[in-house]
Amino acid sequence: MPAEIIVIGTSTGGLKALQTLLCSLPASFPLPIVVVQHRGKASDDGLSEFLGDFSCLPVSEPEDKQPILPGYVYLAPRDYHLLIQNCSFALSTDPPEAFARPSIDVLFQSAADEFQERTIGVILTGANRDGARGLAAIKSRGGLTIVENPETAVCGELPAAAIQRLAPDWIVPLHEIAPLLLKLTEVQGAERPAAPEGAELARHYGS
C-alpha cells in the first residue's frame, strides 16, 4: 500500500541534518512529515520558524487534537510527547522515555499503530538509543525504514542503535535521504528502489 506519513527522529546534530533534508524537498511533496528533535525544556520556541526558513513546506508545532494534513512538516513541541491518534495529533506529559520528552519511540510507535504499513520511518544523527524500538515497530507492521549511515552522521549512536535492533530497508548518507523519499512517494505502489549510492557526507555538522 502507498505510504501516507513520514516520521523522523533525531537528536545531536539534528538541526543541521533537518536543514539538509527539508531544503531538498519540493513544495509539492505529498505526505505529512512529523519530526521529533530532542531538545531541552529551555530550548528556543522559534525552532519551527528556524527550520521553516530552510523548507519549501510549512513547518509548525501541532496542537492537541489537530488534524494531520499532507504537505506539512510538524515538529514535536518541547517537553511534550507527540502521538498520532485517529489521524490527528495528541500531546502527552507522560514521563520521559529513554531520557527524552518528546520521545522518538513514542511518536514512531503511535504512527505504526495508526498507519501500519503506510508509514515511512527515518532515523537521523543522535546521541542515544531513542527511536530504535519505534523504528522496529514500524518495520514489524510492514512500513519502510531508513537510517542515516552512522559512519557519516554527526553522532552515530542513535542510527547505530537502530541498525543493531533491526535490519533497516535502507542505510544511506544524509544527502541521499531526500532523493530516496522522493522516489518512494513519486510512484506509489511501485517496486522499492535500491539504496542510492553517492559520496559520503563530511563530518562537519553540529546541532
List each model region and its residues:
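Conserved acid/base catalytic micro-environments in cytosolic active-site loops
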Residues: M1-S207
